């Protein structure tokens, strides 16, 4: 449906929308989207995801028909390279702004006041969209944000997160559902009480304890029990991903680099990665209990080197990076690092000496505490359809009539999927605390 046109008598016309589009040029969108999101900023974006799916091939083995004996090599000449084909579909994120027509008309002598109001609101929408995209590209595709463990009674509206630092994934006003499991194969989590949700009323987030107060008691969610672990999902996001789920979510770091490795018979975007667990699902390093941070990262780097791979970036939660810095004391070295491809921001990065050279330790709040990723950033990118995020101008305008009220709406959206060209050149690990 075409966007509404306002006559001069109404004091409002298409100039507002032209100005709105001008304000939100690509540079401003990137500046808002990438701020304090090093992984999102660093990922290469390729606007090429046309069609329903994208067939992404990863070559993981060279032809093995050679021999020191001529006759044997000739006999085995039909040996071919080994490749995995992942059939990817897009993940999505949507936001919209509603504008009341009467309020628009009431600003006819000062169109700039309306623009200023909507710019402020749009900035917050882009900020929130980008935060959700950032969470998704770190996640496992299930939509799970964090876990909590119930106490001896469900007659409470307050929960305490198992990992306090993950409290930043929640906001006052958001709606959460409760999952009884946390799948690792891309399937959607099982939601308690047919997906019934509660609203976040307040939160108190610290590095040591995070509590969230909900709009109702846990007892109001059918199927929950005392002293059990459950998982929190943003309403409408517990959809999983995979070839049988064309409207699923995003397979982020946790799914491309599973900490427990691929399972035999799995179907990760239609392929069983267990045929070569390292080259198709990355390397893994599990630190021994009490192992020092420095030792863990050096051992992990050596493990990655065994796979003929090397990383240039190590992503850690700020809590872990702080512990590592304190452990090193005066041995800490820093360098100036630009975590993004756009040059919008430089950040001081600690230097980690790896087996193949220096790696940049980057503080990333969306990495789970206790986990780290050693990444070859040249292997990671986002396959997109238009910008991530972008303004909806599908019908030639930035706005359209609302069907159930006297208003118009402006839509923002993102269509994208995270892609890795060589999982085997990357690693996931855990610290020993």
Indicate where each model-derived feature is located:
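Core alpha/beta structural scaffold of self-assembling particle/tube/pore-forming proteins
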Residues: 1-65, 77-433
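Short, glycine/acidic-enriched capping/hinge loops at junctions between secondary-structure elements
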Residues: 67-69
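Helix-start/capping segments and mature chain N-termini
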Residues: 73-75
